[in-house]
Amino acid sequence: MLSKSEKNVDLLAGNMSNLSFDGHGTPGGTGLFPNQNITKRRTRPAGINDSPSPVKPSFFPYEDTSNMDIDEVSQPDMDVSNSPKKLPPKFYERATSNKTQRVVSVCKMYFLEHYCDMFDYVISRRQRTKQVLEYLQQQSQLPNSDQIKLNEEWSSYLQREHQVLRKRRLKPKNRDFEMITQVGQGGYGQVYLARKKDTKEVCALKILNKKLLFKLNETKHVLTERDILTTTRSEWLVKLLYAFQDLQSLYLAMEFVPGGDFRTLLINTRCLKSGHARFYISEMFCAVNALHDLGYTHRDLKPENFLIDAKGHIKLTDFGLAAGTISNERIESMKIRLEKIKDLEFPAFTEKSIEDRRKMYNQLREKEINYANSMVGSPDYMALEVLEGKKYDFTVDYWSLGCMLFESLVGYTPFSGSSTNETYDNLRRWKQTLRRPRQSDGRAAFSDRTWDLITRLIADPINRLRSFEHVKRMSYFADINFSTLRSMIPPFTPQLDSETDAGYFDDFTSEADMAKYADVFKRQDKLTAMVDDSAVSSKLVGFTFRHRNGKQGSSGILFNGLEHSDPFSTFY
């Protein structure tokens, strides 16, 4: 039995030729709601409430309602006698704030999502119904056809459609996912390899402590990550499948990228061949450019942020700091450290062999086992203007990529020292300490074009490469076709036993692997103790998301051919 709203939707969806959207994603032109005086003429399809017959149901096909008229509602004169004489205090300030602008955008997308998805569902349902009816019609014409059985099949189909409709109305929940194993740990929560029970989708489920995020005012970073993940379908960025929340936690279910991160690859290989390094840095630039195209700067790029997919290609993840600013606590900690090292005495910087620098770098990482996972962070890849809290632009990401290219080829970062303090000091005096590495026989470890690229990336902002087009024109990339990178065979392809193989990630049942996260666990315990368990967490507006393929009963007809994703949130 169709509800009244479903009948009206069917009527309106009879022919979609008049549905159009203007450049702002709102109904316009001669679209859904034309601006003209017309007379109401709504025809009810005959027999819509009749009992279904598998031979020839009277309600199908539906009457063509493409020219259905809709009353234009006349607006009575408004009484403005009680209207406020002036706007509330700080109205413009609040109206133009980032928070308000985001809520406005989310609201717009909600209504666009609502109507597009409604029509998409109705069209898909009609197609399914037509196929079932054609099948039953054929069966009814066969000799010895069983009318009772055909009626039962029709009733069974209607029941399935009813179940599909029910599932569409359900919100995603934690219990919808089966946890397989833990694959990550952060300061605010954990990441699990999980499977959605009904769709069997495998995903990486990030679970964040909601009260802790509110307590530390870190919700902005989570919302930024959610917005970035839902804004693009770029093959270079990790995709979001679901986002939802409950009283205790925020959940981000992302596509699972099974090949581990680029850091693991560097650890296993020590350093890369020049051709392999060129391939990976090319893909990293494509991934970072995809983020820049969305208007975001990552600001905290490091090898751990680049994941390797099942085919061996790069995907960028972890966009929490792309919100616009890095947390004051982190910046202040680094600024204080930079100031302190000015008063410390370090041995004069002398040229060391590649092997000595590599050994020193690895010893530092082993000695300070939480070096890479520190909540404060290391200065190895971060541009100096970011650490100093100065004004910066998107090219700080190019600095980070220059440091990663350097490390990929020789096995240590350009400013690494025997201690973290010495690393800070080297970074502070980067113009003196950035040296072209030499082999034991005196030959340069980098080719001229490699060194030319690195010094155009690790440079003062005014001398740094200014765009992706400038990057592609560098002689270092002369042999790279950026448009066909993902069709090339990568240097490394993960060997996976199944879609749930997590062998390239840390084993959270191993004490040795757990030792890497000592600082993270210690800080997390300290922060958790600050949270009042009795406090009621607020809801994040516009956080919930469900990707289109995960929506029951839709075919995506209205979205085929779109270059970008549908960044639709659900307002609950």
UniProtKB/Swiss-Prot annotation:
Note: Present with 3500 molecules/cell in log phase SD medium.
Family indicated by similarity: Belongs to the protein kinase superfamily. Ser/Thr protein kinase family.
Subunit structure: Interacts with MOB1. MOB1-binding is required for a late mitotic event.
Protein name: Cell cycle protein kinase DBF2
First-listed, main subcellular location of the protein, grouped into a coarse class: cytoplasm
Keyword flag Metal-binding: no
Reaction catalyzed: L-seryl-[protein] + ATP = O-phospho-L-seryl-[protein] + ADP + H(+); L-threonyl-[protein] + ATP = O-phospho-L-threonyl-[protein] + ADP + H(+)
Modified residues (Phosphothreonine): 544
Organism of this sequence: Saccharomyces cerevisiae (strain ATCC 204508 / S288c)
Annotated localization: Cytoplasm, Cytoskeleton, Microtubule organizing center, Spindle pole body; Bud neck; Nucleus
Catalytic residues, chain numbering: 300
Top-level EC class: transferase
Domain Protein kinase: 177-477
PTM sites of type Phosphoserine: 17, 20, 74, 374
Taxonomic lineage: Eukaryota, Fungi, Dikarya, Ascomycota, Saccharomycotina
AGC-kinase C-terminal domain span: 478-555
GO cellular component: cellular bud neck; nucleus; Sid2-Mob1 complex; spindle pole body
Regulation: Kinase activity is regulated by BUB2, CDC15 and CDC5, and is maximal during nuclear division. CDK1 kinase inhibits cellular DBF2-MOB1 kinase activity via phosphorylation of both CDC15 and MOB1.
SMART domains, per the entry: S_TK_X (SM00133), S_TKc (SM00220)
Post-translational modification remark: Phosphorylation of Ser-374 and Thr-544 by CDC15 is essential for activation of DBF2 kinase activity.
EC number annotated for this UniProt entry: 2.7.11.1
Keyword annotations of the record: ATP-binding, Cell cycle, Cytoplasm, Cytoskeleton, Kinase, Nucleotide-binding, Nucleus, Phosphoprotein, RNA-binding, Serine/threonine-protein kinase, Transferase
Induction comment from the UniProt entry of this chain: Periodically expressed in the cell cycle, with a peak before the onset of budding.
Free-text function comment from the UniProt entry: Ser/Thr-protein kinase involved in the mitotic exit network (MEN) and required after the metaphase to anaphase cell cycle transition. Phosphorylates CHS2 to regulate its dynamics and chitin synthesis at the division site during cytokinesis. Coordinates septin and actomyosin ring (AMR) functions during cytokinesis through the phosphorylation of HOF1. In complex with MOB1, phosphorylates CDC14 at sites adjacent to its nuclear localization sequence, thereby retaining CDC14 in the cytoplasm. Also binds to SWI5 and CLB2 mRNAs cotranscriptionally to regulate their decay.
Classification via Pfam families: Pkinase (PF00069), Pkinase_C (PF00433)
